Amino acid sequence: MKLYSRITGTGSYLPPRRLTNSDLAAELATQGVETSDDWIVERTGIRARHFAAPEVCSSDLGLEAARRALQAAGAKAQDIDLIIVATSTPDMVFPSTACILQDKLGANGCPAFDVQAVCSGFIYALSIADAMIKTGAAKKALVIGAEVFSRILDFKDRTTCVLFGDGAGAVVLEASDTPGILASDLHADGKHVGILCVPGHVSGGNVLGAPLLQMDGPAVFKLAVGVLDEAARAVLAKAGKTAADIDWLIPHQANIRIMQSSARKLKLSMDKVVVTVDQHGNTSAASIPLALDAAVRSGKVKAGELLLLEGVGGGFTWGAVLLNL
């Protein structure tokens, strides 16, 4: 019998501290950095973001999202036989955030590892879990995107510090005899490393080089809109579908302009696009599962619908997954 994988539960978590654009602008003003709600909304569509407390790590946020996904799936931690965490802000250099989260969750013993593909991380992680389930290597996987990007922001750079927030999203992906994930498409091009990066590295116990996020916004936008369309069309072709078949586009929640461009290229109304970036900003690898969970819990996205998930991030990395919920 051919094996497939299906999402059976979703979950998400945002830390309690919420900063509106006006809140953030007031804090930045004390450091001599000027911005405003109008400036941020016009360029990004972001109205608020959440920042984790200093003692809270990616594994803590991921743990809460994982628990909610397990509850939604009617599963227990002990049922999980694979944990993949997508993060660019790990708790430690090593061991992996997945191992740390595994112990907190009480799912010890199964394979657990991190995937680092920045904002494409959840797409990469979901695709890996799907492949492992299809080969019989796992039956019930926990796939998590978790980030504390507030730790790596340069709050003197108004072009980047207003964009990002902290959060986590998770799904339970289970073996099924009916297709859930229909196709995936993953890519990377390392020649674009410099347009979105944190160039510091650990050596001899010290962080060497610049430890904070750097981004060439116009270059990222130009590249993103092209590669996202390529990935979207690739998964549709692999699954024998067309853009007209899509019920919902759930893109990486980076910038409303990129999402509008993606929808326009696919000839989709924005009414078919799940948008949550206004509420939590760019949460990197957490953004797609956050948006998916919000849409499922609100009743907007329903079982049986065709979803196109797409992400793009530093590396440069990008990809898409087409699935029936």
From Swiss-Prot:
InterPro entries to which the protein is assigned, alphabetical: ACP_syn_III_C, ACP_syn_III_N, FabH, Thiolase-like
Any Pfam family hit: ACP_syn_III
GO biological processes: fatty acid biosynthetic process; secondary metabolite biosynthetic process
Entries under SUPFAM superfamilies matching the protein: Thiolase-like
Catalysis performed (reactions): malonyl-[ACP] + acetyl-CoA + H(+) = 3-oxobutanoyl-[ACP] + CO2 + CoA
Catalytic site positions: 119, 252, 282
Chief localization: cytoplasm
Keywords: Acyltransferase, Cytoplasm, Fatty acid biosynthesis, Fatty acid metabolism, Lipid biosynthesis, Lipid metabolism, Multifunctional enzyme, Transferase
Entry's localization field: Cytoplasm
Keyword Lipid biosynthesis set for record: yes
ACP-binding as annotated region, ranges: 253-257
UniProt-listed Enzyme Commission number(s): 2.3.1.180
Cellular component GO terms held in the UniProt record: cytoplasm
Recorded metabolic or biological pathway in which this protein acts: Lipid metabolism; fatty acid biosynthesis
Any GO MF annotation of the entry: 3-oxoacyl-[acyl-carrier-protein] synthase activity
Function: Catalyzes the condensation reaction of fatty acid synthesis by the addition to an acyl acceptor of two carbons from malonyl-ACP. Catalyzes the first condensation reaction which initiates fatty acid synthesis and may therefore play a role in governing the total rate of fatty acid production. Possesses both acetoacetyl-ACP synthase and acetyl transacylase activities. Its substrate specificity determines the biosynthesis of branched-chain and/or straight-chain of fatty acids.
Domain notes from UniProt: The last Arg residue of the ACP-binding site is essential for the weak association between ACP/AcpP and FabH.
Similarity comment text for this entry: Belongs to the thiolase-like superfamily. FabH family.
Complexes and interactors: Homodimer.
Protein's name in the database: Beta-ketoacyl-[acyl-carrier-protein] synthase III
Organism encoding this protein: Albidiferax ferrireducens (strain ATCC BAA-621 / DSM 15236 / T118) (Rhodoferax ferrireducens)
